[in-house]
Amino acid sequence: VLMSKGFAKEEPNKQKRRKAWIRYEREYSLSAGHLDWHDPGNGKQVYVVLDDASRKILAGGEFENATEENSTKLVEEVISKYGYIQIIRETITDHGTQFYANKRDKDGKAEHGFERFLEEHNIKHILCRYKHPQSNGKVEKWFDLYRIHRKRFPTFEEFIEWYNNRPHGSLNLRRAE
């Protein structure tokens, strides 16, 4: 309609074929975990380790402060719970100070507890692009569910139990399966 009235014109660059969208997903559970902190505005900081393949919450908690110690503590929890199957191979995080030291020496090295912990356990640390929350979108989407549904449950643990055992929309399985 707009073209017939002279308000728009064809743009050949927009007609070019675009790359097909590829679903980003690991094949096996425990191959990668998405980690992030969230401030829901209730005085607590929420931190979770979300499995990339199944979307299951492997560990999580509501804390007073978002710290590198708390970040390390939950990855340790994942290793102690699931290490008999496999130690998580990669973590995907943003550049938050809980995960990454922004001040580095000329060789790119820094003294940071969380980074040192990952190195000691041979876990690869994948950093998302700056100001690009889509890179860690699976955990960002989980925070939306947290905001909507958390108030229905008396404890964080009950909320996680509900989340991990509800049917997964695209897999026709529960996250725990």
Predicted features along the sequence, with ranges:
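RNase H-like DDE/DDD metal-dependent nuclease/strand-transfer catalytic core used by mobile genetic elements
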Residues: 8, 37-46, 54-158, 162
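Basic, flexible linker segments flanking DNA-binding modules
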Residues: 1-34, 109-112
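Charged, gly/pro-enriched flexible loop segments at helix/strand junctions
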Residues: 153-177
